[in-house]
Amino acid sequence: MNVFFSRLPCIGLLNRGQRNIRFLTNTTTPSNWNKVVSDAEKIVGYPTSFMSMRCLLSDELSNVAMHVRKLVGTKHPLLNTARGFVYESRNNLQMRGLVVLLMSKAAGPSQHTTSDLISQDMVSGIYPSQRNLAEITELIHTAFLVHRGIVNLKEWTNSDGTLKDMQFGNKMAVLSGDFLLANACTGLAQLNNTKAVELISSAIGDLVQGIYHEMPNHLEDNSLGDDITMVTWEEQMFLSHGALLAKSCQAAMELAKHDKEAQGLAYKYGRHLSLGHKLNSELQPFIKSSSTDPVTFSLNSAPVIFHRQTVGQEKWHHQLQQAKTIGRQIDYTKLRSTIKLEDGVTSTMDLCHYHSSKALESIQSFPSSEARSALENIASAVTKF
């Protein structure tokens, strides 16, 4: 058995952060989503709680935690991220790795299985190298999640904490993220598959490019992103939110020696699932049941882009001015009500359904199985608003 499996540290550091950077977390109906995940974990024989427990017991995480304690009392994002890992681990659904495992099991062994694969012991229909890939995928996402917690010190105020503490938090975010990413790269090399390494390496490059081009959540008047269309949105969201899952699914097929057609189908599933969930996430501020809840959303989110394209730039700028308070801050509750009067929200829902259906379509050629059904349930869950 490949011993790399037990050496990957901190795989469970996932999906808890700020600034709307969560992916495939519980944005759909809690009971429905949790059941989908629980059923899927039983199928792959790989509960996410086990991954989190091994992470929490690792020496590396213990050392990081000791330093992060120095940030207590500040508003540095790294502290909240770390708190989420420890105290909200039940919600840390490592969905990228879970999807990779389900895809591996659904596709099964290839007809072109080589001798080196035959010698590997499959567990629950999944090769050890594919399980390692699932953990590597989680580790890469975790590294970028930690990196996104870096604070712009130009916006620092005394209420955030001392400048020295915020600088220290930034250093910890950079070093911790780099450490996790280095471990992921080491794990990639141990897969001994150049095509898989190439795919995941390109996904890392996509993440860097996507995050670089990501717009801030709340934009000023001179940076409203009027030139951003849904085509641009999809390109940027795929780089920052979809490339890792899509290429990890494809790499899982490569590790089992599946042909290019199967690899392409796995890639399409990951791509459409990612975009579907991102749309679901951006819909949440507009479909919450309680209108009294405080609400914020990106002015470059899909519902806003659709709305802007419907009403035109001139009317959109007028609506923005009307939604501003005396202090020139945007009243997002008022702006949300304005946007909901048009078709932006329903258009986003339609696009979400489209990506869900395309994800479902991409796996229909796989043999009927519990794993395929679980993938279908996950794709359907992103349309539960």
For the regions a protein language model found, what residue spans apply to each?
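Conserved N-terminal diphosphate/IPP-binding helix and adjacent helical/loop segment
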Residues: 2-166, 214-228, 356, 378-385
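Transmembrane helix-loop-helix
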Residues: 185-202, 313, 320-321
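A short glycine-threonine-serine/GTX helix/turn-capping micro-motif
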Residues: 171, 228-240, 346
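Small-residue hotspots
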Residues: 134-136, 143, 177, 184, ...
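Hydrophobic packing residues in well-ordered alpha-helices of helical domains and bundles
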Residues: 54-57, 61, 130-133, 197-200, ...
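Acidic, Mg2+-coordinating active-site segments of isoprenoid diphosphate-utilizing enzymes
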Residues: 28-32, 102-111, 115-119, 145-167, ...
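C-terminal charged capping/lid subdomain of soluble metabolic enzymes
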Residues: 334-385
